């Protein structure tokens, strides 16, 4: 059954982006891809996603900055953001402190290496 929900996958690892997108497409989600925070912002302007899977550490603009920009913008604050992080053991909640000493407003996070089944379950829960 077709799904009109759009998920934007943002990571500087093209192989991971492809793997996540293939899994999402197998569950009939529409997908868009970006490889850094600046490209992601452009994609968000083109077509507003329902959910963003966002890597934390990327060139040009990192995931923390993009997440904070989205969550502090009334036009985009309701977009669900799931962070991908290699430092998941340091995360105790979604409003955790990152390197600059600021907290992030992400809706959830998943540690790397990514468990695709767990990520899909999280996406399904958020998409209702």
Segments predicted by a language model, with ranges:
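Non-catalytic signal-transmission and effector/linker regions of two-component phosphorelay proteins
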Residues: 1-6, 117-128
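Active-site residues of response regulator receiver
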Residues: 55, 85
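Charged docking surfaces used in two-component/phosphorelay signaling
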Residues: 18-26
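Acidic catalytic/metal-coordinating carboxylates
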Residues: 35-39, 62-68
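Short hydrophobic/Thr-rich beta-strand motif most characteristic of the beta2 strand and flanking loop
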Residues: 28-35, 43
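Active-site beta3 strand of CheY-like receiver
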Residues: 47-53
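Receiver (REC) domain active-site loop signature in two-component systems and cognate sites
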Residues: 58
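Alpha4 helix (beta4-alpha4-beta5 surface) of REC/receiver domains from two-component response regulators
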Residues: 65, 88-110, 117, 121
């Amino acid at each position: 059954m077709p799904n009109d929900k759009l998920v934007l996958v943002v990571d500087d690892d093209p192989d991971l982006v492809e793997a996540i997108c293939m899994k999402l497409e197998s569950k009939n989600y529409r997908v868009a891809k970006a490889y850094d925070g600046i490209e992601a912002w452009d994609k968000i302007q083109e077509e507003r996603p329902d959910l963003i899977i966002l890597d934390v550490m990327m060139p040009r603009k990192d995931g923390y900055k993009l997440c904070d920009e989205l969550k502090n913008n009334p036009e985009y604050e309701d977009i669900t953001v799931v962070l991908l992080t290699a430092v998941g053991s340091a995360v105790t909640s979604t409003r955790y402190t990152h390197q600059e000493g600021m907290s992030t407003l992400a809706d959830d996070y998943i540690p790397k290496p990514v468990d695709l089944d767990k990520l899909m379950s999280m996406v399904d829960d958020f998409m209702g």
